[in-house]
Amino acid sequence: MGDEAEIKEHLKPQASSETMDKKHNVKGKRLWQKVKYQLVEFHSLPAYLRDNEYIIGHYRSEWPIKQILLSIFTIHNETLNVWTHLIGFFLFLALTIYTATKVPSVVDLHSLQHRLPDLLRKTDLHKLHSELMARLPSSPSSWHVMDLLYNCLPERFSHGNYTDMCVLHSVREDLANLIAPLIFRPITRWPFYAFLGGAMFCLLASSTCHLLSCHSERVSYIMLRLDYAGIAALIATSFYPPVYYSFMCDPFFCNLYLGFITILGIATVLVSLLPVFQSPEFRVVRASLFFGMGFSGLAPILHKLIIFWDQPEALHTTGYEILMGLLYGLGALVYATRIPERWMPGKFDIAGHSHQLFHVLVVAGAFTHYRAGLVYLKWRDIEGC
């Protein structure tokens, strides 16, 4: 019994010592993790993460996925790069839902009354009359669709023979919306949705790239290729609405322009797979390639203006497209020159550096193109071929 007591007494400090060692190890491990996941400066980065020497600090370097995902809510030099395009993605997701559910929702009465003579010349009035009478079963069979249209639209409102039906302004609008589906045949929306899909893919790919690229060299390589593919997709699909809706009545030029930009987009993605494409020395080459891809859209725009020089919608959409080109071009210039951080290195690490400005300009340019797309839809819904 005495020997056992001695043994136990001898083991007690040893166990206590082992416990203390474990505590020290855990504490040291936590301290190491804390140091390891701190933000570092440019000179401490591995070569594959060195892209812009004018951004001096606040880098994440080779963090595990868990810490990277949590860093979306912390401050570092990629925070605004992630959020500018993540917010842009949700903006275009909302615009896509709006377009699918609300465009077109109500006929523009002002446009209808001014376009009515041209529309009626293109319309099968006998078919229109029968369809309208089917929608108005209580109306006298002696009414003719021409009388109904001209007497109930605003310019003839006070002179009609059927004033009992056209007393209130709301009735006029309801009638216009009743007649419009019989005259207007909405065109296909797939080119517009292709653009919206390309924009969402680009914005989400960019946001994901800026969030995850600091994990490892392999992940960085994959994410950058995804980012370049997104840019090419946005540029290529931006051509689809103007080309399709401008040349929908001329299949040769429509297919020619759409085929050209699609092949060019695929070629750009293939070139971006080259490892040298992501090196800092190729920054100007990357910007020039994407800028040239977008600049090729000048041909169908000029072609559109030659054909539809007398159409207000052609001028309206061209104005939007010029603004879009200026925004994208300015973004490419800022990206390539790394302004303003090259003027004051380290001052724009968190906010205001060139890549963040580039992101904002891309979202603004894409939204401008969305507005142009709405004009194309309204134009072609009314005009057709």
Curated annotation (Swiss-Prot):
One of its GO terms (biological process) is response to hormone. Residues 101-191, 250-256, 310-313 are extracellular. It is a multi-pass membrane protein. Residues 1-79, 213-228, 278-288, 335-356 are cytoplasmic. It is found in: Membrane. The chain crosses the membrane at residues 80-100, 192-212, 229-249, 257-277, 289-309, 314-334, 357-377. Its main location: membrane. InterPro entries: AdipoR/HlyIII-related (IPR004254). Residues 1-12 have a biased composition (Basic and acidic residues). Residues 1-22 are annotated as: Disordered. Belongs to the ADIPOR family. PANTHER family: ADIPONECTIN RECEPTOR PROTEIN, ADIPOR/PROGESTIN RECEPTOR-RELATED. May play a role in abiotic stress response. This is Heptahelical transmembrane protein 4. It comes from Arabidopsis thaliana (Mouse-ear cress).
